[in-house]
Amino acid sequence: MARTKQTARKATAWQAPRKPLATKAAGKRAPPTGGIKKPHRYKPGTLALREIRKYQKSTQLLLRKLPFQRLVREIAQAISPDLRFQSAAIGALQEASEAYLVQLFEDTNLCAIHARRVTIMPRDMQLARRLRREGP
């Protein structure tokens, strides 16, 4: 382990806290107001960064399975009314669509950062899709 520099400190003797004098009147202090404690608040952005790290570490699906399955069936119903799906097929569709969306949001975030912003906007997503040659 690397050696670190130690700074000189003034040596201070430990002192016990003084007891209050008994001659003071005990009733002069204001009574405590309700005892309501404020809830702890993190600095803005701390929880967002924690959430980002949590989801980047995990490999779980981000969208719930049943709502995604209903969406797939609704879209398929518009194309052909008598389509049936294996559960593995819907799982593969969900994996692929989530990977696509995550990558799109990463590119969108890069576009926002390039514009010296931290908030993504629709025009960032349009630029990301245009650079990918996906659409207008």
Swiss-Prot record:
Modified residues (N6-lactoyllysine): 10, 19, 24, 28, 57
Outcome after substituting residue 47 to V: Triggers interaction with DAXX
N6-crotonyllysine: residues bearing it: 5, 10, 19, 24, 28, 57
InterPro entries from the UniProt entry: Histone-fold (IPR009072), Histone_H2A/H2B/H3 (IPR007125), Histone_H3/CENP-A (IPR000164)
Effect in UniProt of substituting residue 125 to I: Impaired association between H3.Y and H4 and stability of the nucleosome
Sites bearing N6-(beta-hydroxybutyryl)lysine, chain numbering: 5, 10, 19, 24, 28, 57
Gene3D superfamilies, alphabetized: Histone, subunit A
In-chain residues carrying the UniProt-annotated modification N6,N6,N6-trimethyllysine: 5, 10, 28, 37, 57
Residues that bear 5-glutamyl serotonin: 6
Low complexity bias spans: 1-16
GO molecular function, one term: structural constituent of chromatin
Description of how the protein assembles with itself and partners: The nucleosome is a histone octamer containing two molecules each of H2A, H2B, H3 and H4 assembled in one H3-H4 heterotetramer and two H2A-H2B heterodimers. The octamer wraps approximately 147 bp of DNA. Interacts with HIRA, a chaperone required for its incorporation into nucleosomes. Does not interact with DAXX chaperone.
Known function: Primate-specific variant histone H3, which constitutes a core component of nucleosomes. Histone H3.Y-containing nucleosomes accumulate around transcription start sites and have flexible DNA ends, suggesting that they form relaxed chromatin that allows transcription factor access. Histone H1 binds less efficiently to histone H3.Y-containing nucleosomes. Nucleosomes wrap and compact DNA into chromatin, limiting DNA accessibility to the cellular machineries which require DNA as a template.
Protein name in the entry: Histone H3.Y
Gene source species: Homo sapiens
Lineage: Eukaryota, Metazoa, Chordata, Craniata, Vertebrata
